[in-house]
């Protein structure tokens, strides 16, 4: 298979966390273009299905405007049972999410979709990670909400920040919880691109 330059790759996301994770494994996409799509879940849509649909929709939206590029779409979803916890739009929503997750296990689904030029091939991988938070005190909830670290985070969770001390255990991929499963992403991209880890 012909190996290509990373200049031919578009990341369909403006997430600083995902950009940093890609740089961690020496991947710098040629372009970074966020996709403007409708992110509302469908009625009775399961978290995994939603994550896959969002990653695919982001990649397809960007590739429709850039058909000659490879496009990487990614989506991370926090779920408590079958309930999808979206990004909190205000502190009240963030508080509901944090109280729901307090003392409970939840799942983080991150889907990665790689489209080859003209959508000739489509590769999708989904990683599921189980996380359990300690039971939070009222003071901990208050401090976390005041920090505003919940902003622009799936389920209002930022385990790279203050919420990291809430984690009793994590089973799965830490990088996936942050926003990009590095192992799966590396395996997908290494089939097409020439880059070195070292």
Swiss-Prot record:
Site (Important for substrate specificity): 17, 76, 160
A molecular function (GO) term: dTTP diphosphatase activity
Active site: 75
One cellular component (GO) term of this entry: cytoplasm
Class in the EC hierarchy, top level: hydrolase
EC number annotated for this UniProt entry: 3.6.1.9
Intracellular or extracellular location(s): Cytoplasm
Protein's UniProt name: dTTP/UTP pyrophosphatase
SUPFAM superfamilies: ITPase-like (SSF52972)
Similarity-based family: Belongs to the Maf family. YhdE subfamily.
The organism's taxonomic lineage, starting at the top: Bacteria, Pseudomonadati, Pseudomonadota, Alphaproteobacteria, Rickettsiales
General function of this protein: Nucleoside triphosphate pyrophosphatase that hydrolyzes dTTP and UTP. May have a dual role in cell division arrest and in preventing the incorporation of modified nucleotides into cellular nucleic acids.
UniProt-listed Pfam families: Maf
Cofactor dependency: a divalent metal cation
Catalyzed reactions: dTTP + H2O = dTMP + diphosphate + H(+); UTP + H2O = UMP + diphosphate + H(+)
Domain of life of the native organism: Bacteria
Single biological process term from Gene Ontology: nucleotide metabolic process
Keywords, in A-Z order: Cytoplasm, Hydrolase, Nucleotide metabolism
Keyword Hydrolase: yes
